[in-house]
Amino acid sequence: KTVSLVNFKKILRKYNLKNNIYIGGYYPINSEINCLDVLEILEKNNFKISLPITKKNNKMDFYKWSFKDSLGVNHQGIPEPNTKKKIIPDVLIVPLIGFDRNKFRLGYGGGFYDRYISKVLKLKKILTVGFAFSFQEISKIPINKFDQKLNFILTDKEIIE
């Protein structure tokens, strides 16, 4: 089970985002919802796809990737692009293990996404969409000053905006 492609496209339409833009995705691990099916369909509809490459200092950047390309494996055992064309996505799909109605997320604690979103928002406006299962909702996520609020949370049942 995954999020609705129809609902994701509603979000894109709301911001008048058409194909030929970069969508930043992720390779799902553990309990993260799988976004690869959505990304594959988007790529077939002429959206450009990118995936993160993480570094040992808890930083990451996004790199152009296509389903025709191979993937390497990083120091944590997570598949990553072999390509080295760094880009800044226009829309960033964010993984999570928990979320609340205020659109804050709980990750694995490394701060990769919070740091990346904070850095990129200084350079350009991006749309952030957390992908989640509805059962991952928590009444209130404990937040600190580094936590980044998402624009949307898209679950298998609804859009939270």
Residue positions per predicted region:
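N-terminal active-site beta-alpha-beta segment that forms phosphate/nucleotide-binding
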Residues: 1-87
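Residue-level signal for inorganic ion chemistry
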Residues: 49, 109, 153
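Conserved residues at the C-terminal ends of beta-strands
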Residues: 26, 95, 156
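Surface-exposed, charge/polar-rich loops and edge strands
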Residues: 87-92, 101-104, 115-161
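Short glycine-rich anion-binding loops that position phosphate/pyrophosphate groups of nucleotides
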Residues: 29-31, 97-101
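Charged helix-capping and loop-helix junction motifs
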Residues: 40, 108-114
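Short, basic/glycine-rich phosphate-binding loops at helix/coil junctions
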Residues: 62, 95-97
